[in-house]
Amino acid sequence: MRFILLIALVFAVLDGINCQIAGGLSDVNASEYTGAAWNSVPEINSKNNGQNYMVPIKVVKAQVQVVAGTNTVLEVLVGESTCPRQGSVQASQVTAANCPLKSGGKRELYKVSIWEKPWENFKQTKAEKIRGVKPDEKI
């Protein structure tokens, strides 16, 4: 009897390794979340006190969790743009076309969390700086 229970336990553990935890974060294709990164520019820049706006360079990592809605967690590499914060462009108007990346500008890594409940017309975005990124650092 113990042998059967042991075999059942081994199979349960091996099966659990190959499946995802219900309600847990699941890795997704980061390149598909570039638009979400650009939509988070106002929140990222509310945490930034530099002279110029920060803009996404690339999404380094993306994860999605389905609970009461969808929670998307991104790691976004951002860089200093050519647009001054005190200029005519507001953070909500920043795009790749009107605020290009500044050559040699400051770079940082941010964690962006986006919680959405479409049936309630609810969307909440939070951003927090993880760390600065050195100019020669590969990410």
UniProtKB/Swiss-Prot annotation:
Sample GO molecular function, one term: cysteine-type endopeptidase inhibitor activity
Cellular component GO terms held in the UniProt record: cytoplasm; extracellular space; vesicle
Site (Reactive site): G23
Chain positions of motif Secondary area of contact: 65-69
Signal peptide range: 1-19
InterPro entries: Cystatin_dom, Cystatin_sf
Keywords on record: Disulfide bond, Glycoprotein, Protease inhibitor, Signal, Thiol protease inhibitor
Transmembrane annotation, as ranges: none
Tree of life domain: Eukaryota
Summary of the function given for this chain in its UniProt record: Cysteine protease inhibitor which inhibits members of the peptidase C1 family. Does not inhibit asparaginyl endopeptidase. May play a protective role against exogenous cysteine proteases derived from soil bacteria or fungi, or rotting fruits and vegetation.
Family statement: Belongs to the cystatin family.
Name of the protein described by the UniProt record: Cystatin cpi-1
Species of provenance: Caenorhabditis elegans
Lineage: Eukaryota, Metazoa, Ecdysozoa, Nematoda, Chromadorea
Name of the gene encoding the protein in the UniProt record: cpi-1
